[in-house]
């Protein structure tokens, strides 16, 4: 090897956008594998498993001179002829050698270089992929769980979408997409970074448009009261692209959490809906009373009495015939979302209108009692703070 070799390595490094050191390391690996494969007869899979002799390669980055040696450990009895040499044989090379020493046997690199160059491109490509995967992992690991803005680069024939996120390409599989949306190259979209995977052979950044956290982020972005902690999101249930229910509460008695989320003339909630493919977003008042929370979650339907089985997390709800279909919703959507939001498996029983009137009266009384209890707790807290 000579200076021309060094210049060729420099040119290849420039072409691939990597350092000369990385090119030289890749070439060393190619030389090692060429020797073990061509001279020792090992297959690629065996070499990758660490089989074969130990080979050290030295390359002078200035002159391009290459030195190669096969390293063997001196032992009394040889068990691995590729990595060991018997003491009796070793003494023929060095009369002062001892058991446990390592001996180096020179290898002529010239005849291997041509073979190694054939493998260099493949090894270099593999190393570059590993290097790129490590870079993406280190850059994006701390961003896992965040919402990022990216640009769609391509859509494959199975409908999976690839999104450019600055210096990394993310993978948006069909299972994480909003079903009602169509994606096209050049389109800017917001995505939730669900997982950063270093070991993946394919794309290592998994993103989602269907995740509840994306909706939560958009609400924080549009509703200052949420961003400031005045209004708190307690639970979210989504059927992406179609409908969502969001349970909220206010830590300030002067702030209406539902009104804050909806905004003047519905502007805030409409902006969120537009970002999610016109997904309908219902804002629900959260309550620590499970019955009241379930009643609110089933809105816009009006329901009667509610019986709970807290251990089984089941709720039996009475509803009149004219409210039954509204409580269930199209294709069962309303009750599915309410169940997911509250954590209760909700079942309905039809009730007479008179029964419903009585149930609504009791519900109103319970709600009034709950408001009075809450006001009393806030007054007592204020009194303690002043004291």
Curated annotation (Swiss-Prot):
Gene3D superfamilies in the record: 3.30.300.20, Nucleic acid-binding proteins, NusA, N-terminal domain
Every S1 motif domain range: 145-209
GO terms of molecular function: DNA-binding transcription factor activity; RNA binding
SUPFAM superfamilies: Nucleic acid-binding proteins (SSF50249), Prokaryotic type KH domain (KH-domain type II) (SSF54814), Transcription factor NusA, N-terminal domain (SSF69705)
InterPro entries: KH_dom (IPR004087), KH_dom-like_a/b (IPR015946), KH_dom_NusA-like (IPR025249), KH_sf_prok-type (IPR009019), NA-bd_OB-fold (IPR012340), NusA_bac (IPR030842), NusA_N_sf (IPR036555), S1_domain (IPR003029)
PROSITE patterns documented for this protein: KH_TYPE_1, S1
All residue ranges annotated as the KH domain in the record: 312-379
Gene Ontology biological process terms from the UniProt entry: DNA-templated transcription termination; transcription antitermination
Location within or outside the cell: Cytoplasm
Keywords: Cytoplasm, RNA-binding, Transcription, Transcription antitermination, Transcription regulation, Transcription termination
Transmembrane parts of this sequence: none
Location (main, coarse): cytoplasm
Gene Ontology CC terms: cytosol
Family: Belongs to the NusA family.
Described purpose of this protein according to its UniProt entry: Participates in both transcription termination and antitermination.
Record text on subunit structure and interactions: Monomer. Binds directly to the core enzyme of the DNA-dependent RNA polymerase and to nascent RNA.
Protein name: Transcription termination/antitermination protein NusA
Organism: Thermus thermophilus (strain ATCC 27634 / DSM 579 / HB8)
């Amino acid at each position: 090897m000579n200076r021309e070799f060094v210049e060729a390595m420099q040119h290849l490094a420039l072409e691939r956008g990597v350092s000369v050191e990385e090119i030289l390391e890749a070439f060393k690996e190619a030389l090692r594998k060429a020797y073990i494969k061509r001279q020792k007869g090992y297959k690629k899979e065996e070499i990758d498993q660490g089989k074969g002799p130990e080979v050290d390669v030295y390359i002078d980055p200035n002159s391009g001179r290459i030195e190669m040696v096969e390293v063997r450990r001196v032992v009394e009895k040889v068990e691995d002829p590729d990595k060991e040499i018997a003491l009796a044989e070793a003494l023929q090379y060095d009369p002062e050698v001892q058991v446990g020493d390592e001996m180096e046997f020179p290898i002529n690199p010239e005849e291997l270089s041509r073979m190694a160059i054939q493998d260099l491109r493949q090894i270099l490509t593999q190393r570059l992929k590993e290097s790129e995967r490590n870079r993406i992992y280190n850059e994006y690991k701390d961003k896992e769980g965040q919402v990022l803005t990216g640009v769609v680069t391509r859509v494959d024939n199975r409908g999976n979408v690839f999104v450019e996120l600055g210096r990394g390409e993310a993978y948006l599989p069909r299972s994480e997409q909003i079903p009602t949306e169509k994606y096209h190259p050049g389109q800017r979209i917001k995505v939730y970074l669900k997982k950063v995977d270093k070991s993946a052979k394919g794309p290592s950044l998994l993103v989602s448009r269907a995740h509840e956290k994306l909706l939560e982020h958009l609400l924080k972005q549009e509703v200052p009261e949420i961003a400031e902690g005045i209004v708190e999101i307690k639970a979210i249930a989504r059927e992406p692209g179609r409908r969502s229910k969001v349970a909220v509460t206010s830590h300030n008695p002067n702030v209406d959490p539902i009104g804050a989320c909806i905004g003047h003339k519905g502007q805030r909630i409409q902006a969120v809906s537009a970002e999610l493919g016109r997904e309908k977003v219902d804002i629900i008042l959260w309550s620590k009373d499970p019955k009241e929370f379930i009643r609110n979650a089933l809105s816009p339907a009006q329901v009667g009495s509610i019986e709970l089985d807290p251990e089984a997390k089941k709720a039996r709800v009475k509803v009149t015939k004219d409210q039954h279909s509204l409580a269930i919703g199209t294709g069962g959507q309303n009750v599915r979302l309410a169940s997911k939001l509250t954590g209760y498996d909700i079942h309905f029983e039809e009730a007479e209108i008179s029964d419903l009137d009585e149930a609504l009266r009791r519900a109103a009384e319970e709600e009034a009692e709950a408001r009075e209890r809450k006001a009393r707790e806030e007054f007592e807290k204020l009194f303690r703070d002043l004291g």
